[in-house]
């Protein structure tokens, strides 16, 4: 089961708030495969900077400090997307980072320069201790535009195709259910489908766009043969390891009493700091599984807490969690229909 951000802001409203660009080689590979230089790291970096409001550049306009100039080469200021330093540090995480450097992994204070190899704290998408999602950043400032309507509680059920004058199929309308009532929205120019790696293939296949054999097997009439729909799903396996610790603060211990929980709430209410302001994963480590590799292919998320599964209570003993995931999985999955029912 995939967690789905069915809310304004999408997954940025429910995720771990970590601000993380890909490696430069990822974007350069896309540019090479597509033949489009706009996908390159150099071009993408300018787009990142244009929309960033990065804490490293706060109050540093026109600075001649070489360090600040280097930050300005990699980051932007005044954009919609706020990036901040985490507002909490943990002794146990500092020790973990030090252990990483002792194995030869370099220390870093910025994972977003194109080569994320290193150990350090993640930057987060927050503003003054509050989650900063794409709805707050991009949608809220323009929601009063006369040419924009925002529908909530709306579920897209089908894209309707028509043949245009030159014999090309085009999406000309969208069927939507809003609070139990069906609507058809006509497209004046174009339809943009942006429902994510799970939602987009789901909607396309419900609309008869996909592999004919699969669509026929669930009773969907084929509108357009496009066998790649729902194929090539990529995701990274994450393995969580829990380590019991002694003599240091952990969230498990601090949250084990009513007084501890109350202290969290009071600190957050008064100062927007403390455990209630923290990202679930605070410390990151990017490294190689084999020294012969050119780039980091493993990522560690290190947390000052432990639990059986996300959404379940913290363990009743002091512990930390170090999760590791593969950045470049070679396995591929599918997103296919179980039935023709959009719900």
List PLM regions with ranges.
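Mid-to-C-terminal "cap/lid" subdomains and adjacent gly/pro-rich loops that border
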Residues: 76, 83, 201, 211-317
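Active-site beta-strand/loop architecture of penicillin-binding DD-peptidases
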Residues: 297-343
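Short loop/edge segments at beta-strand edges and connector loops
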Residues: 152-154, 178, 224-226
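Short Gly/Pro-enriched turn/cap motifs at secondary-structure boundaries
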Residues: 3, 72, 129, 273-277, ...
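Short, solvent-exposed loop/turn and secondary-structure capping segments
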Residues: 11, 17, 57-60, 160-162, ...
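Conserved redox-cofactor binding core of oxidoreductases
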Residues: 32-163, 170-171, 240-262
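N-terminal glycine-rich phosphate/pyrophosphate-binding loop and immediately adjacent elements
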Residues: 1-51, 55-60, 169, 221-228, ...
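Core beta-strand elements of the Rossmann-like FAD/NAD(P) dinucleotide-binding domain
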Residues: 180-198
């Amino acid at each position: 089961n995939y967690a789905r951000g069915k809310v304004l802001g999408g997954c940025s409203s429910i995720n771990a708030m970590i601000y993380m660009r890909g490696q430069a080689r990822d974007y350069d590979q896309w540019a090479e495969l597509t033949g489009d230089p706009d996908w390159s790291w150099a071009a993408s970096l300018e787009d990142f900077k244009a929309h960033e409001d990065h804490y490293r550049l706060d109050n540093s306009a026109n600075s001649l400090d070489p360090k600040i100039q280097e930050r300005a080469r990699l980051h932007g200021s005044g954009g919609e997307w706020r990036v901040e330093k985490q507002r909490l540090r943990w002794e146990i995480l500092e020790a973990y980072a030090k252990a990483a450097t002792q194995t030869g992994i370099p220390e870093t204070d910025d994972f977003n320069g194109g080569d994320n190899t290193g150990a350090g704290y993640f930057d987060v998408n927050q503003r003054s201790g509050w989650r900063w999602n794409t709805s707050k950043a991009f949608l809220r400032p323009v929601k009063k535009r006369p040419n924009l309507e925002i529908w909530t509680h709306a579920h897209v059920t089908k894209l309707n195709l028509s043949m245009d004058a030159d014999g090309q199929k085009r999406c000309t309308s969208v069927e939507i259910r809003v609070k139990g009532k069906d609507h058809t929205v006509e497209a004046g120019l174009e339809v943009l489908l942006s429902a994510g790696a799970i939602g987009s293939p789901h909607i396309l296949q419900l609309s008869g766009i996909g592999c004919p054999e699969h669509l026929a097997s669930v009773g969907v009439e084929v509108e357009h043969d496009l066998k790649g729909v729902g194929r090539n799903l990529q995701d990274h396996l994450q393995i969580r390891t829990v380590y019991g610790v002694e003599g240091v603060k952990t969230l498990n211990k601090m949250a084990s009493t009513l007084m501890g929980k109350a202290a969290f709430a009071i600190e957050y209410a008064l100062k927007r700091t403390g455990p209630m302001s923290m990202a679930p994963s605070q410390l990151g480590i990017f490294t190689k599984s084999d020294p012969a590799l050119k780039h980091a292919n493993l990522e560690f998320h290190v947390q000052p807490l432990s639990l059986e599964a996300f959404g379940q209570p913290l363990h009743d003993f002091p512990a930390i969690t170090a999760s590791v995931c593969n950045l470049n999985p070679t396995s591929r999955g599918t997103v296919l229909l179980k039935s023709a029912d959009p719900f």
